[in-house]
Amino acid sequence: MGLRMSESAKPYFAMVCLQFGYAGMNLVTKTVLDRGMSHYVLVAYRNAFATAAIAPFALLSERKVRSKMTFPIFMRIFLLALLGPVIDQNLYYIGLKLTSPTFSSAVSNIVPAITIILATLFRMEKVEMRKVRCLVKVMGTLVTVVGSILMIFYKGPFINFFRSHLTAASSPPTADYLKAAVFLLLASLSWASFFVLQAATLKKYSAHLSMSTMVCFMGTLQSLALAFVMEHNPSALNIGFDMNLLASAYAGIMSSSIAYYVQGLMMQRKGPVFVTAFNPLIVVIVSIMSFFVLGQGIYLGGVIGVVVLMVGVYAVLWGKHVDDDGEETRHEDNVVAVKCCSGNNGLTIMPKIDEADEEDVETGKATSEKESSVPEVVVVVFCSENVHSVSRPN
């Protein structure tokens, strides 16, 4: 039981750790952007480091299981590189430079809501409002949005927890806030689209390490082309062994290569809604780290927003947990227990009969449609004393 609980907790632990990595990336990149580093150059180097970090593992571990590359899959990977490494990262860095890590991560909490909408439209997530679990997921997502809005538009009085000498930080101009909000909302839309497309692509190309490598490599090429066009000066791509290089390496290795790998694994197991449900934790972590590391003050609106955010995140995760339990229960119900005496060699096929079929058998009035359909069966092969069972779906 303990081992089983440990296995079930691994996805949650992995996603929480990932949010700490994203929070650190916010603080480090904010520092280098304020010092004058171009976000186009930062994105290009970030994806170059990500490619170099993840490519060896993909080449060694997936050389025998790598799926065949087709043109439709290649175009999906190209689009993934455009949505994630290029559009999302550049727009997010613009918003981050204009405001603060807390504000940027707060606006990005709209990602789970957009992901649920897109996943529902593409039939990757079922939303049945008559069921409590689905209603809780939707309401939890809306609550996270409300918490983000509180953190963005309501500051309230300054809170000095330890009676320190921290003072309320000066706010950027309103025009910068509005401009940053637009860029961050567009980045969130691109990021949510990336998650949904990644989940769909993994069903066609299951080698997630190889796919992450190709996404990072494509993103590097696209980002370099964009940097050359926007900077108008090739020397802008030159960086030394300084904070700029450290920020690029950290963002590339932690927030791109490792993040894409972990997200890909969780996407295959839990789906895009589960992955994005943890995004609101970033603003909580960033707020705490900004207070202790950067010396930025905390306001009452931020504290209230964090509490509301946590309630929303818990509601969404509870709904997903109930969904997962329901899927496991339905899977177990599809397995038919077969009891036979040892020593009977041969092949036994037993169809699964539901309640409606039982009534038809009893009355002898089974319809022709039921006769033409292929029932789910369990094939049991008896060879000496060994029993092997194979479940075949409809």
UniProtKB/Swiss-Prot annotation:
GO cellular component, one term: plasma membrane
Keywords: Membrane, Repeat, Transmembrane, Transmembrane helix
Pfam families for the chain: EamA (PF00892)
Domain of life per record: Eukaryota
UniProt key word Membrane: yes
MF terms in GO: L-glutamine transmembrane transporter activity
Segments crossing the lipid bilayer: 13-33, 40-60, 67-87, 102-122, 142-162, 180-200, 209-229, 245-265, 273-293, 298-318
Cell compartments where the protein resides: Membrane
Chain ranges of the EamA domain: 22-147, 189-317
GO biological process: seed development
Membrane topology: Multi-pass membrane protein
Repeat as UniProt keyword: yes
InterPro entries per UniProt: EamA_dom (IPR000620), WAT1-related (IPR030184)
Family membership: Belongs to the drug/metabolite transporter (DMT) superfamily. Plant drug/metabolite exporter (P-DME) (TC 2.A.7.4) family.
Protein name (Swiss-Prot/TrEMBL): WAT1-related protein At2g40900
Species this chain originates from: Arabidopsis thaliana
Taxonomic lineage from the root: Eukaryota, Viridiplantae, Streptophyta, Embryophyta, Tracheophyta
